[in-house]
Amino acid sequence: MNANGGHDIQLVIITGMSGAGKTVAIQSFEDLGFFCVDNLPPSLLPKFLELMKESSSKMSKVALVMDLRGREFFDSLIEALDEIGETSWITPRILFLDAKDSVLVSRYKETRRSHPLATTGLPLEGIQTERELLEELKGRSQIIYDTSDMKPKDLREKIVQHFAADHGHTFTVNVMSFGFKYGLPIDADLVFDVRFLPNPYYIDSMRPLTGKDQEVSSYVMKWNETQKFLEKLTELLSFMLPSYKREGKSQLVIAIGCTGGQHRSVTLAEYLADYFKKDYYTHVTHRDIEKKSRK
């Protein structure tokens, strides 16, 4: 029970770019036992939550998909979020799904569907319009997933790992390795560049391996600069993480980048996740590990 006599509700609002994976997301929340509503008009959101508060069903987990169909729809959503924000009995979390424009265009071509905001029928026009309209909403979002390199199962796994009630944590440290050659991860809160470390790519026996292999991991970790860097980085993060948690942040995405996302970044991401798991719920992902390594 909360201070107002109602029951506590975990509310997740799923929004973001059309084609970024909202259908997969809502299905994943259903699998987690959330009460799910697809395309609830924003103007009805405050009333919907009041009804849930007064309901005898005591649903404690709710996920709502809210799509952008036009500027009027967007304005209503912002107003609804402001109204909810003035209440003290519920704090919604916004999950924003994003992807690169080129990926979204490709997905629309594969499905042969029209973008809802494309007046000329060209997907890119609608995508650019939608991205501009959603800029403020993205800025309000507590959780941002870049699904550009995700298969549906990857997105489903990420949601389950983040929102599954059985892990009993309200703050998650997500450590991600990536390759700079494939672009920066747009959902990262902190990015660290480890391209200054000796690169096992140039050793023939290690080139086809990854940082999850012992031979590569031992090579990366044996250098003095690696040990010094990790000493300073863990000290910095140990200072920062409690403050992020205190501010109410539900997750922190720490991205470690090397050239191709195969060797150095993978080794260090694995190390950091293991280092902090004693104090935080941690999850490690390797964004580019399955991509073919090439120079």
From Swiss-Prot:
<dbReference type="GO" id="GO:0005524">
    <property type="term" value="F:ATP binding"/>
</dbReference>
<comment type="function">
    <text>Displays ATPase and GTPase activities.</text>
</comment>
<keyword id="KW-0547">Nucleotide-binding</keyword>
<dbReference type="Pfam" id="PF03668">
    <property type="entry name" value="RapZ-like_N"/>
</dbReference>
<dbReference type="InterPro" id="IPR053930">
    <property type="entry name" value="RapZ-like_N"/>
</dbReference>
<dbReference type="InterPro" id="IPR053931">
    <property type="entry name" value="RapZ_C"/>
</dbReference>
<comment type="similarity">
    <text>Belongs to the RapZ-like family.</text>
</comment>
<protein>
    <recommendedName>
        <fullName>Nucleotide-binding protein BLi03725/BL03417</fullName>
    </recommendedName>
</protein>
<feature type="binding site">
    <location>
        <begin position="16"/>
        <end position="23"/>
    </location>
    <ligand>
        <name>ATP</name>
    </ligand>
</feature>
<dbReference type="GO" id="GO:0005525">
    <property type="term" value="F:GTP binding"/>
</dbReference>
<dbReference type="Pfam" id="PF22740">
    <property type="entry name" value="PapZ_C"/>
</dbReference>
<keyword id="KW-0342">GTP-binding</keyword>
<dbReference type="InterPro" id="IPR005337">
    <property type="entry name" value="RapZ-like"/>
</dbReference>
<dbReference type="InterPro" id="IPR027417">
    <property type="entry name" value="P-loop_NTPase"/>
</dbReference>
<keyword id="KW-0067">ATP-binding</keyword>
<feature type="binding site">
    <location>
        <begin position="67"/>
        <end position="70"/>
    </location>
    <ligand>
        <name>GTP</name>
    </ligand>
</feature>
